[in-house]
């Protein structure tokens, strides 16, 4: 519902033309996503790696932005990818704003409050795009914990006001989404996934242990296909011996193939001492891996 409210309805109201092609807002969302990646990496470096050079920042941000599968979403600009990209963009903007809030001095209350509220608004809007991505809201804990829990700022009057600014956007968006869900699907907690007009019955997909291992290997270690014409890489299909129906899509490689920066996870044991002195960073890494 959020992409419709942000793009489809305003476009129809201004032009009188229905059915805005998803490709147009997806291009804008892709640029906003890339901007958020650069902003997030900058704030993360400012907090945890203040001695990092500009070259290291640019290389990391460019690698993170280009390593995500935005290109795949733009390659298939349908309603399905539209919602995914919108949700991912809001997730990155939320994390960026929360890091900005954590890095903002407490004497700059207006800027601090704005970053907290805007970040929460973005994360709340994720539920109206791709509800599963709301799991990334857990990253607010290690980001904001040192200031508001460790330093006990939450127990002060100003801290309580900042907490209200953090919570209020979530409550307002949640009320709106729950009202919409109840009006359209009969329950405030039903986001309509079971009503998708798709190739399979969403209400009977079930959970099968036999599908876990092939899916994990495919989406982590899968590699793209190769062809003799530009761009030389092609999509491949998931191969499985599961004795049953497995709904799959074309993919261009798993996480480790599309995002080589993840190879750096192999060096985490070497950074144990540094991570030991940065508990919040260690928690962020663990939560990202879990999500």
Model-derived regions: residue spans:
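Membrane-proximal envelope and lipid/glycan-remodeling enzymes
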Residues: 1-291
